[in-house]
Amino acid sequence: MRDLAPDIFRQRLLIEGWYTIDLDRDGVARYLGEVAAHLGLRTYAEPIVYSPAGLGKRENQGYDGFVPLIDSGISAYVWSGPRFFSVLLYTCTGFDEAAAVEFTRRWFQARGDVASRSF
């Protein structure tokens, strides 16, 4: 992808995997707050988490969460049926990508491989 704004620092990391823990709305909010704290990223509001509550396709039910950072934000998308998660960390300050992946893997008690890509 071509960098259209080379003077603006951005670090983006996508992490995906299959979770084994019991997860609800509060759990998604806890993850968002804890991953930010673990990486030393500063939040300016509490995480917000939404659930479509039966709207849309059954296989897409789960949670969508976001925590705003002083330097951008973290989003989490969780599918309840297949027990799949997809997390996007987007910051205008640097963070340790390996620490983010390992924290996420452990927090979700991921089964099998966890995939990640920075861009």
Predicted regions: what they are:
Residues 1-119:
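Polybasic/polar functional segments that serve as interface/processing modules
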